[in-house]
């Protein structure tokens, strides 16, 4: 048993006895498990001394791993113990058996990925639709009907909207000029747009010929001629020549060059079909910020500008053209905020909850302002008290230190206090109220005179003038104001 137990010693044995058999369990690995593992290895015709080293444990793991699916419980337990021992030899801390198995699986996955990457690097680079056959020859695979159908469907539904360009770029990955012409020929309608595209291609082909003149003299044997603009466009070159240019050493990527020309023409077409300028994209008062960002970047994609200019438009116009609510939030974030931070901060702006919160904040500010104004007004209206005893300000008579004045503090007479003083004083109209005689000064003293306008003369009695006698008689008959004749007539 001593030989079997000598697999671990010292610190490694202590680490072995700290590892649990199951996650959260009480039982831990002991020395008896090493003895049992040695006996099981002998039963499976394996050398027990392999348990003493890291490499030996790795060999045992490789040997047992292939039999795990069909093996018994004893085999699985032996495999688990060897995996734990493998990490103990490497002095890697594991808490239980499951953690050791997870680490081993992760390690094996990384190793497999590295091997696949090495194998891929050794193989010849292959770009669809040009692939390498079994004999090692580069052959062409035509675009599938599904790819062409997807392209036609995009044109029919989107009608040269900005998202057509990335769709074309994805479908034409690695395509030859012949494949690109096939995609363009499948477009049935929009012939005006296709004519614009042809004009752009011809302009770019002429520019290519100007920048790449033909070298004088014959072409050396075994060497391909240099492609002209029409060769890149696929009108004067064969499929085999295109494949040779694309796979040669050094290669001439005629497919990628032609693809750039087409995308340049598509940008002009998208600009024509989407005349809205990026400057006109502004967020509505109640429009969600997410919808505004979608419209902004959709229009930005159609802009014919460099990436630096588009980045500047995104940093400046996206904030500048937002509504006031979002603009306040975005300016508070600062110029270095990411798009994710902007959309998170402006989420819910414009909705009923946001409006209610803004209104509550405004009302709270207005209320606090009114309270502060009231407090300040009360402070400004502080009365200045005056002492009736000495006549000085700043204290009242109760607290006056001067000798008490004798008599009434108002009239100066003795025998009564100021509250009982009958000295005449002005009423609220500013008139003196006479004491003990007559009516108060705020009552009318005389009988009011009538203030009605004189009776109008309508001209009915212009020819009749009363005689002086009648006037005198009328005056005599009029009773005095204090008489009762107006009520009882001629009653004696």
Curated annotation (Swiss-Prot):
Region Interaction with membrane phosphatidylinositol 4,5-bisphosphate, annotated ranges: 73-77
Record region (PPIA/CYPA-binding loop): 213-221
Segments of this protein annotated with the region Interaction with host CALM1: 8-43
One GO term describing the cellular component: host cell nucleus
Motif (Nuclear localization signal): 26-32
Annotated region (Interaction with host AP3D1), positions in chain: 12-19
Asymmetric dimethylarginine: residues carrying this PTM: 404
PROSITE patterns: ZF_CCHC
Superkingdom of origin: Viruses
A Pfam family annotated for this UniProt entry: Gag_p17
PTM annotation: Gag-Pol polyprotein: Specific enzymatic cleavages by the viral protease yield mature proteins. Capsid protein p24 is phosphorylated possibly by host MAPK1; this phosphorylation is necessary for Pin1-mediated virion uncoating.
Domain remark from Swiss-Prot or TrEMBL: Late-budding domains (L domains) are short sequence motifs essential for viral particle budding. They recruit proteins of the host ESCRT machinery (Endosomal Sorting Complex Required for Transport) or ESCRT-associated proteins. p6-gag contains two L domains: a PTAP/PSAP motif, which interacts with the UEV domain of TSG101 and a LYPX(n)L motif which interacts with PDCD6IP/AIP1.
Miscellaneous note of the record: HIV-1 lineages are divided in three main groups, M (for Major), O (for Outlier), and N (for New, or Non-M, Non-O). The vast majority of strains found worldwide belong to the group M. Group O seems to be endemic to and largely confined to Cameroon and neighboring countries in West Central Africa, where these viruses represent a small minority of HIV-1 strains. The group N is represented by a limited number of isolates from Cameroonian persons. The group M is further subdivided in 9 clades or subtypes (A to D, F to H, J and K).
Name of the protein in question: Gag polyprotein
